[in-house]
Every structure is written in structure tokens, then in C-alpha cells.
């Protein structure tokens, strides 16, 4: 395997991952997680904290899922961008939780300029929910802060070749919204757009008003038989 197609797959603490300079590319779908998704994640973290206290489980680590990053490089081989291919929903949510636990915390995902109104609305609503959770769980906050450093980890896959990244795209986290096949095809084409990418992205999204089951039906009838 050459240097363009090889990839690295390693566990990484969530704290360290959130501090990386990550970019949300234009082809990514909006942030769709709801309060229920956030509540499930908070409960999972709480369970992980309890498990870590059990005798013999002090080295226990809870994996929040897999994150796929495409490392975009310049001609000299230096990384210029770390684009999130998979794991955006979890990373944004974990960043919101971390911010609520530590108001001084910020990262590239929190500073990102979200242009989609659904993303803005869901981020705002979920952060309000996390603050509400924080107000009634004040006795647990120190444990949750420690979990980010010592218990929570992700599997980080770093890919140099973008085609390889999209081949790995079907490695989905069970907590996330399942992707339809047209999401991948849309993403593959949108990543080639250089100018006016966001305007083109919105044009494609308007086409997505077609019900997903109809698109899946078209894929099964016409695309899959030739693959």
C-alpha cells in the first residue's frame, strides 16, 4: 500500500481529539442530533464512569465511536486541513458537553460558522439541554470532567487519500443518524466543488426533498446491479 492510500487507526482520548484543529467540509450534512441523542450520550458517559469504579476496571475505557479524518496535504506533504468525513455529530455534541463542563473550553468545531439553520437551531437547543442537565447534576460534574481525560476515547482513522476516506465512510456509529446511500454519492461529488460550494450544497439539499425511500428504491433498481 503506498503512502497516498495507507491510513492510521488508533485509539485517542476524547480530550485530545477535541483539541485537534478539525474542519467540517461543505459536503457534510447538517447537525441533526436531538435532545434524546444528547441524553443517551450523557447516560452512556455516566455508565462508563460507574464501570470505571468497579474493582479491576480502573483501566476501563469507553469508546464513543469511530471518527474518520481526511488529512489534506500540500505538495510538500504537510497537512493543511483535517476534514471530518465521519463522526461530525458526536464530535460537535461532545464539544458542547465539554464547553458546559468547562466554560473556558473552545475548539475549531465550536468556532465554526454554521450556515445551516437546522444546525444552528439544534446546536443551540442541545446546549440549553446540556446546561439544564448540568444544573441538576452538580454533584457529578467533576466525574464527567475526569471522564473526558481518562475514560472516554474514540477510534481515530486518519486517511491521506480522500477516495480511501469515502470507502471507509460506511463505518457508522450506532448512536448517529444512519446514512442513506445517496448521502455518500452526494458527498463524493460535492467534495469536488471549489467555488460557491455552499450555494451548490444548498441546491443539492433542495433536491433532497424527495422522500429517502424513493431514492433508496432507485439505487436498488439501477445502481447496485452494476456495482
Question: What does each of the following model-derived ranges do?
Answer:
Residues 1-227:
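Covalent nucleotidyltransferase
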Amino acid at each position: 500500500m503506498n503512502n497516498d492510500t495507507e491510513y492510521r487507526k488508533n485509539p485517542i482520548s476524547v480530550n485530545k481529539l477535541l483539541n485537534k484543529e478539525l474542519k467540517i467540509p461543505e459536503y457534510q450534512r447538517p447537525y441533526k442530533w436531538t435532545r434524546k441523542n444528547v441524553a443517551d450520550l450523557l447516560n452512556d458517559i455516566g455508565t462508563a464512569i460507574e464501570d470505571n469504579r468497579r474493582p479491576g476496571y480502573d483501566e476501563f475505557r469507553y469508546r464513543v465511536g469511530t471518527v474518520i479524518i481526511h488529512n489534506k496535504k500540500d505538495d510538500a506533504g504537510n497537512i493543511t486541513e483535517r476534514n471530518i468525513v465521519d463522526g461530525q455529530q458526536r464530535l460537535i455534541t461532545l464539544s458542547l458537553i465539554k464547553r458546559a463542563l468547562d466554560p473556558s473550553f473552545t475548539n475549531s468545531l465550536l468556532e465554526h460558522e454554521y450556515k445551516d439553520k437546522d444546525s444552528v437551531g439544534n446546536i443551540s437547543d442541545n446546549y440549553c439541554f446540556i446546561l439544564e442537565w448540568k444544573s441538576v447534576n452538580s454533584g457529578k460534574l467533576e466525574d464527567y470532567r475526569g471522564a473526558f481525560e481518562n475514560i472516554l476515547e474514540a477510534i481515530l482513522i486518519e486517511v491521506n487519500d480522500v477516495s480511501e476516506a469515502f470507502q471507509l465512510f460506511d463505518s457508522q456509529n450506532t448512536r448517529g443518524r444512519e446514512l442513506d446511500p445517496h448521502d455518500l454519492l452526494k458527498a463524493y461529488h460535492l467534495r469536488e466543488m471549489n467555488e460557491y460550494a455552499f450555494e451548490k450544497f444548498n441546491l443539492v439539499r433542495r433536491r433532497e426533498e424527495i422522500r429517502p425511500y424513493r431514492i433508496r428504491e432507485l439505487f436498488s433498481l439501477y445502481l447496485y446491479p452494476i456495482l
